[in-house]
Amino acid sequence: MGMRMMFTVFLLVVLATTVVSFPSDRASDGRNAAANDKASDVITLALKGCCSNPVCHLEHSNLCGRRR
């Protein structure tokens, strides 16, 4: 294989890898953003002591967890 042919193959591999990686990056960003929002809510409630308060825990059981 000549140098020009090897360079062409290299560029095709890089291009194919880049095109394949973009859709998966966009999909994971949405999931990560949703997980980060929920994590920030849990941290906020925990810092305020809400999860240790029975009444508040019942109102926000989706954020504090179902166990009590």
Swiss-Prot record:
The effect of residue 57 to A is:
2-fold and ~20-fold decrease in ability to inhibit alpha-6/alpha-3-beta-2-beta-3 and alpha-3-beta-2, respectively
Q: Where is the signal peptide?
A: 1-21
GO MF: acetylcholine receptor inhibitor activity; ion channel regulator activity; toxin activity
Q: Where is this region: Ser-Xaa-Pro motif, crucial for potent interaction with nAChR?
A: 52-54
Top-rank taxon of the source lineage equals Eukaryota
On tissue specificity, the annotation reads:
Expressed by the venom duct.
Annotated compartments: Secreted
* Disulfide bond positions: 50-56, 51-64
Q: Which PROSITE patterns match?
A: ALPHA_CONOTOXIN (PS60014)
Please list the residues that carry the modification Cysteine amide.
Answer: 64
The question of whether Disulfide bond is a record keyword is answered with: yes
Q: Name the principal localization, coarsely classed.
A: secreted
Example of a GO cellular component annotation carried by this entry: extracellular region
Keyword list, A-Z: Acetylcholine receptor inhibiting toxin, Amidation, Disulfide bond, Ion channel impairing toxin, Neurotoxin, Postsynaptic neurotoxin, Secreted, Signal, Toxin
Q: What is the effect of changing residue 62 to A?
A: No change in ability to inhibit alpha-3-beta-2 nAChR
Positions annotated as propeptide: 22-48
Q: What is the effect of changing residue 63 to A?
A: 2.4-fold and 15-fold decrease in ability to inhibit alpha-6/alpha-3-beta-2-beta-3 and alpha-3-beta-2, respectively
Give additional notes from the record: There are currently a number of patents describing the use of this peptide in therapeutic applications.
Q: Which family is annotated?
A: Belongs to the conotoxin A superfamily.
Q: What does this protein do?
A: Alpha-conotoxins bind to the nicotinic acetylcholine receptors (nAChR) and inhibit them. This toxin blocks neuronal mammalian nAChRs (alpha-6/alpha-3-beta-2-beta-3 (0.39 nM) > alpha-3-beta-2/CHRNA3-CHRNB2 > alpha-3-beta-4/CHRNA3-CHRNB4 = alpha-4-beta-2/CHRNA4-CHRNB2). Also exhibits inhibition of D.melanogaster alpha-7/CHRNA7 nAChRs. In addition, inhibits alpha-6/alpha-3-beta-4 (CHRNA6/CHRNA3-CHRNB4) nAChR with a higher potency on human (IC(50)=1.49 nM) than on rat receptors (IC(50)=31.5 nM).
> What is recorded about the protein's domains?
The cysteine framework is I (CC-C-C). Alpha4/7 pattern.
What is the protein name stated in its UniProt record? Alpha-conotoxin MII
Question: What broad taxonomic lineage does this protein's source fall under?
Answer: Eukaryota, Metazoa, Spiralia, Lophotrochozoa, Mollusca
